[in-house]
Amino acid sequence: MNAIVDTGYLVALLNRNDEHHDWATGLAEKLTLPLLTSEAVLAETAFHLQSSTYVLKLLQEQVLQVAFECVSHLEHLQDLAIGYADRHPDFADLCLIRMSELYPRHVVVTVDDDFRVYRRNKRQAIPLLSPPKK
């Protein structure tokens, strides 16, 4: 399965103490490499893990691929930021919404419930993989 990955998934995958770690590791076996993401997601992930080491290793091993250059999509990102201003999306979320438009055959893997509200191409639900609700 082709996937675009969000910060929460990567943190859960790499942090054994994360509440979604078992879900993330089980899902990892089903995802096709490389997993697509943005630099914003990588920065957030390194911040939450308090280390860049794991992120860099996943890039070097081609588990992750940066497949989005934000400067090429600034106008669209701005439109998304304005359209979802009431939800206060972070920059990484805006990038992933746009990536889901650019890679329509990929699912977004996230623990973020806001992606249930976000839409690609203004009206289409974004295909998601998220942990089950407890």
PLM features: residue spans?
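Low-complexity, intrinsically disordered Gly/Pro/Thr-rich segments
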Residues: D112-R116
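A secondary-structure boundary/capping signal
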Residues: D6-T7, S38, V111
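Metal-dependent nucleic-acid phosphoesterase active-site entry motif
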Residues: M1-D18
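PIN-domain endoribonuclease scaffold, especially VapC-family toxins
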Residues: A3, D22-H88, R98, L102-H106, ...
